Amino acid sequence: MRMYDVIEKKRDGGELTDAEIDYFVSGYVAGDIPDYQASALAMAIFYKGMTAHETAHLTMAMAESGDMMDLSAIPGIKVDKHSTGGVGDKTTLVVAPLVASLGVKVAKMSGRGLGHTGGTLDKLESIPGLSIEISEPDFFKQVSEIGVAVAGQTGNLVPADKKLYALRDVTATVDSVPLIASSIMSKKIASGSDCILLDVKCGSGAFMKDVDSAIELADAMVSIGEHVNRTTAALITGMDRPLGKNVGNSLEVIEAVATLKGEGPKDLTDVCVELAANMLNLAGKGSVDDCRKLARQQITNGEGLAKLAQMVKAQGGTDEVIFDTTKFEAAPFRRDIVSETSGYITSMNAELVGISSVALGAGREKKGDPIDPSAGIILERKTGDYVEKGDVIATLLTGDESRLDEGERIFREALAFGESAPELEPLFFARVSKDGVERFA
């Protein structure tokens, strides 16, 4: 077999065989296929697409390119959740303990933040002492004993994706549904859970800017899951405006704790309850309606919060900051962003809010950049709110005073004002499962 022939076949719109896909993935990981041929195939896939079977086989070949976690020794159904990323998206910190507190095991491998979206691991690492580097035996033990663990990817998980993702990033082939779907699902499948819930964001702060492209991606990922016998569903949720009021690392942990106490912002609480309900439903805990009630009950009775504290302690963190969030170290420098006009906030571009928080030190512009755990933004007002000239819209926080001017400049760019209240985008657009697409909006 020659790589040239595989590239030519896809360039001309042909369907690759399983053997051709295996040849490409194993050869690329081994270093036998050079980057220039891999990028030529990625571009051919970008233009010609892939069938559902091709995409599923590519996903499995990538998943099997390294270690595969076998969670079968852990009793019960294991569920995983993946978010395609957004601004203020601290849902894992709420949803994982909520679901685990109802007896469903959550074994989650998470990522770091890159670009304008924050990573769950960076948020968790703002908790003093907490480690996200957990050995495989300890990960298994923690999931078995307390029902939940959130860790960084261990060892040699999906090396094919690491190589292919880095290549797509510099060859303008990121925005391809088969390549995005196989990248996400290969990691989820290699992580070993029985059920996978996908939170596919759409809007200005998301990777997918419109509902139809978000549904197309969700459908591709659900199809892959069903092809490889993983119960999979996806929710399409809005990311036109930041989720909740806090954007940052420790700031988002503080808001997640408030949400588990029943004191969180309504939008964040509603999204977390919906995600938890759908995860519980996939695990066979009842209808989505019944599971929604169960999730809200675990907020009211405090069991979700107790489970988060248990997880933090198990991973070496100081659980007292969960019970008293004032013990988090506060940022030494802050600046109020005051409205220069009176009127309704008609838009608060989530992507620019995210970029502003990165400028303040809450995220990284390139891999390996250090993160300021206390930096970020507290939103006092959001899209749809009326403000008078002089009202505080947000507070910027940072450990480096020199970052405030740039943070403010970008944040102000995110805002638009008008004389009448805007129509707010819904939080939920659709649910995608093996039964098809159910649209809510």
What do these predicted regions represent?
Residues M1-R2, K10-S72:
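N-terminal glycine-rich anion-binding loops that anchor highly charged ligand groups
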Residues D5, K10, E15-T17, Y28, ...:
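Well-ordered secondary-structure scaffolds
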Residues G49-S110, L114:
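Active-site cofactor/substrate anionic-group-binding motifs, chiefly glycine-
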Residues M109, V143, A151-Q153, D199-G203, ...:
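Short beta-strand segments
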